Amino acid sequence: MSALRQIAFYGKGGIGKSTTSQNTLAALVEMGQRILIVGCDPKADSTRLILNTKLQDTVLHLAAEAGSVEDLDVADVVKIGYKGIKCTESGGPEPGVGCAGRGVITAINFLEENGAYDDLDYVSYDVLGDVVCGGFAMPIRENKAQEIYIVMSGEMMALYAANNIAKGILKYAHTGGVRLGGLICNERQTDKEVELAEALAGRLGCRLIHFVPRDNGVQHAELRRQTVIQYAPDSKQAGEYRTLATKIHNNSGQGVVPTPITMEDLEEMLMEFGIMKSDEEALAELEAKESAAAN
């Protein structure tokens, strides 16, 4: 039996992280891999496309109903989805009350202690990445996830979040085995997107694992609560996700300790690509507009 691989998909909210991870995992299960998904996002949408359902009941919600997490069985919180993929959602508290990361910690500890990680090839954590606070960093900090894949795009805030996540990985890389597996660029059709993604990967010392092209078929599948792999298995987009899955499967042991950059370096990189103007250029442009308006 091969060693259990614990991977995690991090990325800023709205980047398509959960969609990318679920399509990739659907492709991996077709390759004969045994998988457990642990959703670590308060939206609890990390398993929706695998289960073909609205939202899965979360560990925190079920624990509150039962009285405590100790009153639950694994069967209560782990549901079986597409081709046998096991799914669970950690959940979070009501908005404005408590720490959402607490659900992550509670769920992972419960699953480990109750044998949910037995007889698996992959455990995949789907984690919110706008903030790398204690709870959301738990899969990294506690050496649960060994390979981190950052889902990003050519948009500035996605690049900024990716660099921040790399900082979080670096913080714990030397005390545990966590490594940056690479970047996954989810196309947003911004200027020079592939080049920017490759440039950031170079700065972080990792690889751009795959560039996932934008395709309307993804939305069509999501409306039916399915992955593209299930909804349109013979489509070109399904092929893209299978390629990504194969690359991740072959990337075992290839992770790196990242070399995150400063905000100034990130802005400089954006200016090099003409995505962002320098203060001098912005000021000159403003003065030119004011001068034209005055005349």
Curated annotation (Swiss-Prot):
Which GO terms of type biological process are on file? nitrogen fixation
Q: Which GO terms describe its cellular component?
A: nitrogenase complex
Asked if the keyword Nucleotide-binding belongs to this entry, the reply reads: yes
* Database matches in InterPro entries: NifH/chlL_CS, NifH/frxC, Nitrogenase_Fe_NifH, P-loop_NTPase
Assigned EC number: 1.18.6.1
| Entry annotated with the keyword NAD | no
Record note on modification = The reversible ADP-ribosylation of Arg-102 inactivates the nitrogenase reductase and regulates nitrogenase activity.
Q: Where on this chain does [4Fe-4S] cluster bind?
A: C99, C133
A GO molecular-function descriptor: 4 iron, 4 sulfur cluster binding
Q: What class of enzyme is it?
A: oxidoreductase
Query: What keywords were assigned to this record?
Result: 4Fe-4S, ADP-ribosylation, ATP-binding, Iron, Iron-sulfur, Metal-binding, Nitrogen fixation, Nucleotide-binding, Oxidoreductase
Q: Sites of the modification ADP-ribosylarginine?
A: R102
Q: Would you say which domain of life the source belongs to?
A: Bacteria
Reactions performed catalytically? N2 + 8 reduced [2Fe-2S]-[ferredoxin] + 16 ATP + 16 H2O = H2 + 8 oxidized [2Fe-2S]-[ferredoxin] + 2 NH4(+) + 16 ADP + 16 phosphate + 6 H(+)
Per UniProt, subunit arrangement is: Homodimer.
Assigned protein family: Belongs to the NifH/BchL/ChlL family.
Q: What is this protein called?
A: Nitrogenase iron protein
Query: Where does this protein come from, organism-wise?
Result: Rhodospirillum rubrum
What is the name of the gene encoding this protein?
Answer: nifH
